[in-house]
Regions:
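Ankyrin-repeat and related helical/solenoid repeat scaffolds used for protein-protein interactions
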Residues: 182, 186-246
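Alpha-helical segment of the N-proximal tetratricopeptide repeat
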Residues: 14-26
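Amphipathic alpha-helical scaffolding segments comprising HEAT/armadillo-like alpha-solenoid repeats
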Residues: 1-7, 28-40, 61-73, 92-104, ...
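Alpha-helix N-cap/helix-start positions at coil->helix boundaries
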Residues: 13-14, 29, 44-47, 62, ...
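Alpha-solenoid HEAT/ARM repeat scaffold
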Residues: 17-18, 33, 46, 50-54, ...
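A generic tandem-repeat structural signature
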Residues: 46-123
Length: 264
């Protein structure tokens, strides 16, 4: 048995945690099995099991999915969370489908880890997950709609353009609108410019307007400087001003610095 595998069985949590960290991304079947056993060991601390899940999430051996996918349906929210984290290295259609479903989980940590894993698997999401993510944009729970939008933006898939525009314009929840506006910036299609500009100028929620400023910086319209400087001049919200200033800088324009008291 290798030294690393022996360290997994140490009575010292410090040594075990070091072994878990060293095993991150391993392609050794025995090491991966040790991580899986660690993840499932109920006598260990939650943080140690979570660390094992995160290390497992960087491993790409396909047999991991067969073990973890059923765990996403477990009664224990902690088990579902660790399964979502541990699937972070799996690029199969089954893994992507399961992680997209994880965005609808009733527990926040499961949703968060499902999103985090999907964000690290964008090429596989492009292949297997776009349609199911689009379907989630109309989910009744905003905390499922928002992460679906964020992941979709990074796919840069044209199929997401119209659904994200509809969400950005019509969703009654500002968190969902903010996610959709940000996603439109990441998506990168100029067809979204008019909607993003309207959001910058007139959305009632300051954080949506700030997201629109960020999105304009990514979409890079010919009049970006004019739009962003107008927002700086007319919108007193500091979050919006910070986003507009950062967008201007990203486009190569000079802008005053911002400090804790506002713009200098």
């Amino acid at each position: 048995m290798s030294d690393l595998l022996n360290q997994f069985q140490s009575s010292s949590e410090e040594i075990r945690r070091a072994a878990i960290t060293a095993a991150s991304g391993s392609s050794d079947g025995e090491v991966v099995q040790a991580l899986i056993r660690h993840l499932a060991e109920g006598s260990l601390s939650e943080s140690e099991r979570q660390l094992a899940a995160e290390s497992l999430g960087k491993c790409t051996l396909p047999e991991i999915a067969a073990i973890l996918l059923p765990m996403l349906a477990a009664e224990s929210a902690l088990t579902r969370t660790m399964a979502a984290a541990g699937l972070g290295g799996q690029q199969s259609a089954a893994a992507i489908t399961a992680l997209v479903s994880g965005l609808t989980d009733s527990v926040n940590t499961v949703r968060n880890w499902s999103e985090r894993s999907l964000l690290g698997l964008i090429s596989a999401v492009q292949q297997y997950g776009v349609e199911s993510l689009i379907a989630l944009l109309s989910h009744e729970v905003r905390l499922s709609r928002s992460p679906a939008a964020r992941v979709l933006g990074l796919t840069q898939d044209e199929r997401a353009l119209s659904p994200l525009q509809l969400m950005a314009e019509k969703d009654s929840d500002w968190l969902a609108r903010m996610a959709a506006i940000k996603a439109l910036g990441d998506l990168g299609f100029p067809e979204a410019l008019d909607l993003v500009t309207r959001a910058l100028q007139s959305d009632p929620k300051n954080r949506v307007r700030a997201a629109a400023a960020e999105a304009l910086g990514k979409l890079r319209p010919h009049n970006a400087e004019q739009l962003l400087r107008a927002a700086l001049d007319t919108d007193e919200d500091e979050g919006l001003q910070k986003s507009a200033g950062e967008a201007l800088r990203s486009l190569g324009f000079e802008v005053s610095a911002i400090n804790d008291d506002g713009w200098e």
